[in-house]
Curated annotation (Swiss-Prot):
Its membrane topology: Peripheral membrane protein
Complex formation: Homodimer.
Naturally occurring in which organism (per UniProt): Homo sapiens (Human)
A Gene Ontology BP annotation from the UniProt entry: dephosphorylation
Protein name: Chronophin
GO MF annotation list: heat shock protein binding; magnesium ion binding; phosphoprotein phosphatase activity; protein homodimerization activity; protein serine/threonine phosphatase activity; pyridoxal phosphatase activity
Tissue-level expression: Ubiquitously expressed (at protein level). Highly expressed in all the regions of central nerve system except the spinal cord. Also expressed at high level in liver and testis. In fetus, it is weakly expressed in all organs except brain.
Its EC number(s): 3.1.3.16, 3.1.3.74
Subcellular location: Cytoplasm, Cytosol; Cytoplasm, Cytoskeleton; Cell projection, Ruffle membrane; Cell projection, Lamellipodium membrane
Needed cofactors: Mg(2+)
Amino acid sequence: MARCERLRGAALRDVLGRAQGVLFDCDGVLWNGERAVPGAPELLERLARAGKAALFVSNNSRRARPELALRFARLGFGGLRAEQLFSSALCAARLLRQRLPGPPDAPGAVFVLGGEGLRAELRAAGLRLAGDPSAGDGAAPRVRAVLVGYDEHFSFAKLREACAHLRDPECLLVATDRDPWHPLSDGSRTPGTGSLAAAVETASGRQALVVGKPSPYMFECITENFSIDPARTLMVGDRLETDILFGHRCGMTTVLTLTGVSRLEEAQAYLAAGQHDLVPHYYVESIADLTEGLED
């Protein structure tokens, strides 16, 4: 049972010694805004030298995989391959490739509520986008899925159009994630994809398929490409309701870092209330603290 214990000393060495790999969330874990968390790049280098696999799982749907890889490099995280990066945008593209209804000779289109990074990921997967000039001439393909991602230009008109498509019972409703809000550098909040998805669900009367954390579907995307034993894998994140719940659902050892959204007091409150799926096994002040558990 998870007890939210501080990870240090002999326990830290034991946990990292048994682990074959680590899954990291990105925002609030590796970096905040345009600044890497102090010591985070060095930790990843040490993990690589120790032969521990590191993979990265983000609910952020704003960047396609190549752009996300560039951000890692810009913030000082060198030596990583794009194949190590898994975003909710990438996983949404995979799900739509698998489940988009319609005959093979008449593939349907996806109506996207989201930015250019999400659209680029879908195009890279060979999907057609509603209203996309790149779809070519001729009759517009039938919309067979509505995808809700992070959309800074969300509007009533977009909501109305999404609902019109969803009147077709065969049209899928997919959301990249349910993060309700995101913190800003000034301490305020901005609405997240979860808020937009809730609006579409309420207005359409439909329930979205969610691909991002805490959905195990994201873990399925990872295990399609990497051989992972969840019992010997750590999930390190900053958000109890997404990262830690995701880790528990997938059978991993969970570690909360306090450099992001969730506070230690919240985890302790969940522990007192018996909501153990939201309680991390361990916590650290920063992921840089994990370096002490690795042998030179």
